[in-house]
């Protein structure tokens, strides 16, 4: 890449970064609490600061509507159907079974065995390492040597038809050909 095009990319990046920073400053409002802007500084005429409300847990916001004091967001509907939550009870923990209770009905845990570790096999095997290696196949080199190629194709990245000698049928070897690696008869 030329240095001129690199400088253009850097300049575009810096311009985009300053535009994003200006946009964030408009959204956030002035920095500090109650400070007046510095004299001589232009005020951005854009949307004012975004109003963010922190909701209590269990309160569902409805888009475009503010909750009315004294009313539930949905009339006549409890937050959890058929259950009244106790004030000290967490709704997530309320669904978990007791410590002594078995999660799977009809099955009792085996004594002295962790239920999570009981599901794992004794020896975890890698499927690639479990397969026996083919003896001598990857190191196999066919007899002879590759012929000399006088001309090369003008492509900068030619396609290869083979990678190693065993990719080629019969007595052919994988050699550098006219345009990339190809299966050729050896000398």
From Swiss-Prot:
<feature type="repeat" description="13">
    <location>
        <begin position="118"/>
        <end position="123"/>
    </location>
</feature>
<feature type="repeat" description="SVP-1 clotting 1">
    <location>
        <begin position="64"/>
        <end position="85"/>
    </location>
</feature>
<dbReference type="InterPro" id="IPR008197">
    <property type="entry name" value="WAP_dom"/>
</dbReference>
<dbReference type="GO" id="GO:0005615">
    <property type="term" value="C:extracellular space"/>
</dbReference>
<feature type="region of interest" description="Disordered">
    <location>
        <begin position="28"/>
        <end position="98"/>
    </location>
</feature>
<keyword id="KW-0873">Pyrrolidone carboxylic acid</keyword>
<dbReference type="Pfam" id="PF10511">
    <property type="entry name" value="Cementoin"/>
</dbReference>
<feature type="repeat" description="10">
    <location>
        <begin position="100"/>
        <end position="105"/>
    </location>
</feature>
<feature type="domain" description="WAP">
    <location>
        <begin position="139"/>
        <end position="187"/>
    </location>
</feature>
<feature type="repeat" description="9">
    <location>
        <begin position="88"/>
        <end position="93"/>
    </location>
</feature>
<feature type="repeat" description="7">
    <location>
        <begin position="76"/>
        <end position="81"/>
    </location>
</feature>
<dbReference type="GO" id="GO:0019731">
    <property type="term" value="P:antibacterial humoral response"/>
</dbReference>
<feature type="repeat" description="1">
    <location>
        <begin position="34"/>
        <end position="39"/>
    </location>
</feature>
<feature type="repeat" description="11">
    <location>
        <begin position="106"/>
        <end position="111"/>
    </location>
</feature>
<feature type="propeptide">
    <location>
        <begin position="22"/>
        <end position="126"/>
    </location>
</feature>
<feature type="repeat" description="4">
    <location>
        <begin position="58"/>
        <end position="63"/>
    </location>
</feature>
<feature type="repeat" description="14">
    <location>
        <begin position="124"/>
        <end position="129"/>
    </location>
</feature>
<feature type="repeat" description="6">
    <location>
        <begin position="70"/>
        <end position="75"/>
    </location>
</feature>
<feature type="repeat" description="3">
    <location>
        <begin position="46"/>
        <end position="51"/>
    </location>
</feature>
<feature type="signal peptide">
    <location>
        <begin position="1"/>
        <end position="21"/>
    </location>
</feature>
<feature type="repeat" description="5">
    <location>
        <begin position="64"/>
        <end position="69"/>
    </location>
</feature>
<feature type="repeat" description="8">
    <location>
        <begin position="82"/>
        <end position="87"/>
    </location>
</feature>
<dbReference type="GO" id="GO:0045087">
    <property type="term" value="P:innate immune response"/>
</dbReference>
<feature type="repeat" description="12">
    <location>
        <begin position="112"/>
        <end position="117"/>
    </location>
</feature>
<feature type="repeat" description="2">
    <location>
        <begin position="40"/>
        <end position="45"/>
    </location>
</feature>
<feature type="modified residue" description="Pyrrolidone carboxylic acid">
    <location>
        <position position="22"/>
    </location>
</feature>
<feature type="region of interest" description="14 X 6 AA approximate tandem repeats">
    <location>
        <begin position="34"/>
        <end position="129"/>
    </location>
</feature>
<protein>
    <recommendedName>
        <fullName>Sodium/potassium ATPase inhibitor SPAI-2</fullName>
    </recommendedName>
</protein>
<dbReference type="InterPro" id="IPR002098">
    <property type="entry name" value="SVP_I"/>
</dbReference>
<dbReference type="Pfam" id="PF00095">
    <property type="entry name" value="WAP"/>
</dbReference>
<feature type="disulfide bond">
    <location>
        <begin position="168"/>
        <end position="183"/>
    </location>
</feature>
<comment type="function">
    <text>Inhibits Na(+),K(+) ATPase by the competitive mode against Na(+).</text>
</comment>
<dbReference type="InterPro" id="IPR019541">
    <property type="entry name" value="Trappin_transglut-bd_rpt"/>
</dbReference>
<keyword id="KW-1015">Disulfide bond</keyword>
<feature type="disulfide bond">
    <location>
        <begin position="146"/>
        <end position="175"/>
    </location>
</feature>
<feature type="disulfide bond">
    <location>
        <begin position="162"/>
        <end position="174"/>
    </location>
</feature>
<keyword id="KW-0677">Repeat</keyword>
<dbReference type="InterPro" id="IPR036645">
    <property type="entry name" value="Elafin-like_sf"/>
</dbReference>
<dbReference type="GO" id="GO:0007620">
    <property type="term" value="P:copulation"/>
</dbReference>
<feature type="disulfide bond">
    <location>
        <begin position="153"/>
        <end position="179"/>
    </location>
</feature>
<keyword id="KW-0732">Signal</keyword>
<dbReference type="GO" id="GO:0004867">
    <property type="term" value="F:serine-type endopeptidase inhibitor activity"/>
</dbReference>
